[in-house]
């Protein structure tokens, strides 16, 4: 199971931030398989683990821990694809944000959740536990949305506060320079709290007819995306973010899918030859393997994310699934990957 992926438009702001810092992004991008051809492809996506590693490498090589804030300040509405172009034509800032939230899946898929809008709050989902690899993701997401608010209203929109889940990092003073409002750390959510009047501001490029046309295109793209997702994938999407909390029941998942419980049970059997509890167990197993293989999260952090009572319980479960302790599995995978990369470089030399 994948942790998710992003449209390559999300890399444009990282590219611009590095250039603004006097860095050439091309060698770094190519090291992570991000070529000019990939950046120009309309359907291209990059996995979230690769995005994390690329961002962390950019921080290290530019010596700029606050690079996520710089990324957000470099964002353009066009980076959000068709949904961004539709949002630009909305009648108000509130409608623009609602458009971006509704069609977020066109440019971003993350099993941890999706952004939400509950005026005056525009919220980015939690990606805790936090570490040096993922702070920049929250920074860039919130800074980008703040920047869009300014762009779409010709600088008139105002933030009241910014709330961030993780504790203040070493570069905390950079936040108020970026957001121009109080920034509170250690909060219950990652969110921008807008001045309510700002959300009613008209957009500088509002165009009702064009907005309606682009909304139809976005809706068509979303329907096509859903049409190609099997019932199992839709259940996994609901179950996955809840693994570290109380797991949803079959009836609760059915309600979210707009199906009677018996219909969901029947469709899982006939279309996927599986049961609801099997999906829960297999989702936990697949995510455990993905976290060990593709991230640098500590074992205790992975245990928390997957709802295990302790690190020891996670290690026992992982050994049962794979026949190896998680640490040994990770080391073996990394060694194999390093050997393959060495062979590939030798083959091109």
Language model segments and positions:
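Short hinge/gating elements
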Residues: 81-87, 127-131, 199-200, 220-222
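N-terminal low-complexity or simple alpha-helical regulatory segments
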Residues: 1-122
């Amino acid at each position: 199971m994948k942790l998710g992926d992003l449209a390559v438009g999300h890399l444009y702001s990282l590219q611009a931030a590095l250039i603004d810092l006097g860095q050439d992004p091309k060698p770094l991008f190519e090291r992570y398989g991000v070529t000019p051809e990939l950046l120009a492809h309309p359907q291209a996506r990059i996995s979230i683990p690769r995005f994390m590693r690329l961002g962390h490498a950019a921080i290290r090589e530019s010596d700029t821990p606050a690079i996520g804030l710089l990324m957000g300040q470099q964002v353009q509405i066009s980076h959000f694809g068709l949904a961004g172009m539709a949002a630009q034509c909305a009648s108000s800032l509130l409608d623009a944000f609602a458009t971006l939230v509704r069609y977020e899946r066109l440019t971003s898929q993350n099993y941890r959740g999706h952004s939400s809008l509950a005026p005056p709050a525009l919220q980015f989902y939690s990606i805790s536990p936090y570490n040096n690899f993922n702070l920049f993701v929250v920074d860039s997401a919130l800074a980008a949305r703040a920047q869009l608010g300014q762009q779409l209203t010709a600088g008139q929109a105002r933030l009241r506060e910014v709330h961030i889940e993780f504790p203040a990092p070493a570069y905390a003073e950079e936040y108020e320079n970026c957001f121009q409002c109080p920034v509170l750390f250690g909060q219950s959510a990652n969110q921008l709290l807008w001045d309510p009047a700002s959300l009613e501001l008209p957009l500088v490029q509002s165009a009702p007819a064009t907005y309606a046309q682009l909304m139809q295109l976005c809706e068509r793209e979303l329907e096509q995306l859903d049409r190609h997702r099997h019932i199992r994938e839709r259940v996994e999407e609901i179950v996955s973010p809840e693994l570290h909390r109380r797991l949803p029941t079959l009836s609760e998942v059915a309600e979210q899918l707009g199906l009677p419980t018996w219909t969901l049970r029947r469709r899982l059997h006939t279309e996927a030859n599986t049961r609801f509890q099997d999906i829960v167990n297999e989702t936990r197993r697949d995510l455990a393997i993905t976290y060990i293989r593709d991230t640098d999260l500590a074992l205790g952090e992975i245990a928390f994310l997957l709802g295990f009572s302790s690190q020891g319980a996670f290690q026992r479960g992982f050994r049962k699934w794979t026949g190896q302790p998680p640490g040994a599995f990770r080391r073996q995978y990394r060694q194999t990957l390093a050997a393959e990369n060495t062979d590939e470089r030798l083959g091109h030399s």
